């Protein structure tokens, strides 16, 4: 069975989601094409913020140089524990419940922390952040945005691993 996925090479998709608020979830299947340790951030697969902002305002979900999931907002960057493999499909879910952030990798909790929420920002990006730095180099598939914080069981149901 053939399953086609969007292949990103420095570009990104932008959309507007009105009234998303500070509780939402994003589910993304990702395939990293960048060599490990090739740059400090291998790529941002999801972002929320004002388009072309000079600073990294807003928030983003991506991979650091080691291939670990990272969540970044205007004040801090949170890092997961597990390394992902290049050229292999993985599933990430970002769960934002106001000031609480959880990030799952292949159904397992990787990041759980408090983080300032982005409010009244309606612009979302796939394949990059609002400032266009370290855009995604690889594939993204079956991305979904939910207007609420998903439960742990719902996240596990999205990731069959």
Positions of the model-derived regions?
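Beta-strand-rich interaction surfaces with strong enrichment in secreted/lumenal proteins
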Residues: 14-17, 79-84, 113-115
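Short, solvent-exposed beta-strand-to-loop segments that form ligand-recognition rims
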Residues: 105-125
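Short, aromatic/His-centered strand-loop micro-motif at the edge of beta-sheets
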Residues: 69-91
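Extracellular glycan-recognition modules
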Residues: 2-70, 86, 96, 100-104, ...
């Amino acid at each position: 069975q053939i399953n086609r996925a969007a292949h990103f090479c420095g570009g990104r998709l932008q959309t507007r989601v009105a009234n998303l608020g500070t509780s939402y979830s994003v589910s993304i299947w990702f395939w990293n094409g960048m060599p490990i340790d090739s740059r400090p951030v291998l790529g941002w697969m999801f972002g929320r913020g004002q388009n072309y902002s000079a600073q990294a305002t807003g928030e983003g979900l991506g991979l650091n140089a080691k291939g670990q999931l990272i969540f970044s907002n205007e004040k801090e960057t949170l890092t997961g524990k597990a390394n992902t493999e290049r050229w292999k499909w993985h599933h990430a879910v970002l769960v934002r419940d106001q000031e609480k952030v959880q990030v799952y990798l292949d159904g397992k909790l990787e990041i759980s922390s408090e983080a300032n929420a982005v409010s009244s920002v309606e612009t979302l990006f796939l394949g990059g952040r609002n400032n266009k730095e370290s855009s995604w180099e690889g594939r993204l598939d079956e991305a979904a945005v939910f207007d609420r914080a998903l439960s742990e069981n719902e996240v596990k149901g999205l990731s069959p691993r």
